[in-house]
Amino acid sequence: WLTSQPQPWRATVALDSAAYHVEKIMQNRHSRFYDQAFGDQPSNWKALSPISQLHQALPAFLAVCSTTRPDQPCTQAQQFIQHAQKLGTKAQLLPLPLSHFEINKSLGKDNSYTQAVNQFIQTHSFTIE
């Protein structure tokens, strides 16, 4: 049913994830949300943890994060970005003084945040022929 091969995955824009290091989250005090998402089996946490699974370069990666959240997602995002860069990934951090809700709601509006995300996408886009 495919008339041509899919184009390669070019880039990721991660919006305010606070779960780059699942093992660390689960070993410390955390929201019940994480128990629902990742379960109560420590043996599974490493397999579910993006930073633990990062062993080779990824396509370009932009981590958008909130600087106002008490769980400090920018700290985890920065650690992930640094690890990805060491492996050769073109990775960037975009910290914003917005809540998680505001990060999701304001993307696409006429603001500097949307412009930064668009610039990242354009930098890593390609022409489909």
Regions found by a protein language model. Name each.
Residues 68-72:
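Acidic catalytic loop of the alpha/beta-hydrolase fold
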Residues 50-58, 75:
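Conserved serine/cysteine hydrolase catalytic core
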Residues 57, 62-66:
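Short beta-strand/loop motif that positions the catalytic acidic residue
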Residues 64, 75-81, 85-129:
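C-terminal catalytic histidine-bearing segment of alpha/beta-hydrolase fold enzymes
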Residues 1-5:
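Short glycine-enriched nucleophile-adjacent loop
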Residues 7-19:
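A conserved short beta-strand
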Residues 17-53:
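Mobile cap/lid helix-loop segments that gate and shape the active-site cleft of serine hydrolases
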Residues 6-7, 55:
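Alpha-helix termination/capping residues and helix-transition junctions
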